[in-house]
C-alpha cells in the first residue's frame, strides 16, 4: 500500500523572535517493511543555516537555524511511502526466551550486535530482581519468546490501572510498580524493564 503524507507544523510566537534553532525528524526511514518513494521538506522563513545528517539509529535529521526576526515558523513535508505488510510469525514458533537471552551474553555474536545495545539500563528503565520475578511468571522455562512477551503484556494490562494523574514524565518506575497505576509510557517502560531483567533487549 502506498501513502501520500502531508505534515505541517506551525509555530506562532507571542513576540518577535530574533534567532531560533531547530531539529526536524520528519523524513520517513526506509526499512525492510517500507520504502520512501519521495520526500520534501520546506521551511518558512528560509533558514540561514541548514544541515542534514543521520542520527545513531539511521533516522534523517534536519538541523536548521533562523537568524532573522520572525513571528512564525512553518515546516511542511510531503512524503510518499510504500508499506509492505507481512504476516507476523506465529508466537508459538519463536525460540525459547532463554535461547534468545543467551545470544546477548558475552561474547556477542555478530547477528545480535544491533539489538545488543537495548539490553542495558537507561535512565528511565532499569532491570531489577523484583521485575525479573514479575516477568518470570510469564516466561516459564522453555516458553517461546513471543508467547511470553504477549502474556507479559496481558498481565501488565490486567495488573495496572490507567490513571493520567498518577505519574509524570519524571516518575520513577519503582513508584509505578508500587502504586500499580500510570499511563502508557509507564507501562511501556515496565514491559521493557521486565524484559531487560531477563537479559532480553
Place the predicted regions along the sequence by residue:
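Functionally constrained cores in energy, signaling, and assembly domains
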Residues: 2, 13, 21-24, 70, ...
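Active-site neighborhood of thiol-dependent amide/isopeptide-bond enzymes
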Residues: 9, 77, 141, 145-201
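Intrinsically disordered, low-complexity N-terminal segments that are enriched in acidic
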Residues: 1-106
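Acidic low-complexity segments
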Residues: 78, 85-157, 171-175
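Flexible, active-site-adjacent loop/turn segments at secondary-structure boundaries
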Residues: 11, 15, 24, 39-41, ...
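Solvent-exposed, flexible loop/coil residues
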Residues: 17, 21, 30, 47, ...
